[in-house]
Amino acid sequence: MKQDRSSALFQQARQSIPGGVNSPVRAFKSVGSDPLFIQSASGCTITDVDGNTFIDYVGSWGPMIVGHCHPQVVEAVRQAAGSGASFGAPTEREITLANMVIDAVPSIEMVRMVSSGTEATMSAIRLARGYTGRDNIIKFSGCYHGHADSLLVRAGSGAATFGIPDSPGVPADFAKHTLTAEFNSLDSVRQLVADNPESIACIIVEPVAGNMGTVPPRDGFLEGLRQICSNEGIVLIFDEVMTGFRVAYGGAQERYGVTPDMTTLGKIIGGGLPVGAFGGRREIMEMLSPSGSVYQAGTLSGNPLAMSAGIATLSLLKQPGFYESLEEKSRHLAEGITDAARLAGYPIQTTRVGSMFCAFFSGQEVYDWAGASGCDTAAFAAYFKAMLNEGIYLAPSQFETAFVSAAHTDADIEATIRAAARCFKLIS
């Protein structure tokens, strides 16, 4: 596969952009190659600057659930851009998207729009602290909630990929208020709560961990968190930046039937444009400025282009049978890859929730960060490169999730399974 132009652009980028990329995992460092520079995308495919076209399972890290360049989304953005890119003032579109989110997500009675998932989680935690009058928070090893200082403690995603769970530049005084439990372990949560009585403001969790691969919650885990928080006066925050509108229209909380106090969103609700949101119970949300005393603001919050793309995307998701079709495609793909590995005699563990899935290069069940971090990352890198040569674009890290979109056809799924079968045989 020719990559001359991508490699040349990467060398140029490294002279003006730190590491040559604007988000670390894009550098392909963990798989030992230069990144692809993308020229265009359409449906479920992306094309790089060297003219190579790939079936895409990254989907811009989750937002592109209806596929790239969906005509309805493109037209919505085009019309919005013709009226002005940003006003720094309220628009009717903000109300429309807010009401769509409120109607969809069980926990959300009011919602505030922001510009990124990091901004959403950072603001939600500030609000939880203001609401409870407490300082400490609990997060989980391997769960990534953005790059805010207090959340870069034993994080997943890019931090896991590079083996840097704690970033330099985060003061110890910030990190000391972040307590870390083990995902899928209620005992570890109970111990932290017992050791820090009446000091925990919130527990923040990815209801399906998607930044250490795809790790589903075990039976009773989310229900147990809900009970602990209710008993102890702790705000339960579901970080659904990834799972929101992905694993169900109402997110993981709809799929699992557990309602948190607050929810953070991003990715899909912007239809591919920069966006985030956080919402929850009215009594909590009304503490936000200007109605309350907890401050939060943003120049581009509620950006009209992002709101328009979000409205168009959520309208598409509401079409009858959308999630049923996506579920079937995703099931077929995950089972096909599992069977391909088994027939090649290659040990992997495949996990899936809705249209999120991961092939862990491990012979052991993965249900927490300890299991995920024990995977054979060298084997994954070999698989990644082999799949890329087959025209299949996966996330360049063992610790990321793959995403299926509505644009993937049965033929795309079958082609991917056949490619995986050849790749497992090649690396076994």
Swiss-Prot record:
Keyword list (alphabetical) reads: Cytoplasm, Isomerase, Porphyrin biosynthesis, Pyridoxal phosphate
The cofactor(s) it depends on are: pyridoxal 5'-phosphate
Q: Which GO terms describe its biological process?
A: protoporphyrinogen IX biosynthetic process
EC class of the enzyme, as a word: isomerase
Which residues are reported to carry the modification N6-(pyridoxal phosphate)lysine?
A: 267
Which superkingdom heads the taxonomic lineage of this protein's source? Bacteria
Sorted alphabetically, which Pfam families does this protein's record hold? Aminotran_3
From the UniProt record, give the pathway where this protein acts.
Porphyrin-containing compound metabolism; protoporphyrin-IX biosynthesis; 5-aminolevulinate from L-glutamyl-tRNA(Glu): step 2/2
Query: Where is this chain's protein located in or outside the cell?
Result: Cytoplasm
Q: Which GO terms describe its cellular component?
A: cytoplasm
* Primary location class: cytoplasm
Q: How does it assemble?
A: Homodimer.
What is the name of the protein in this document? Glutamate-1-semialdehyde 2,1-aminomutase
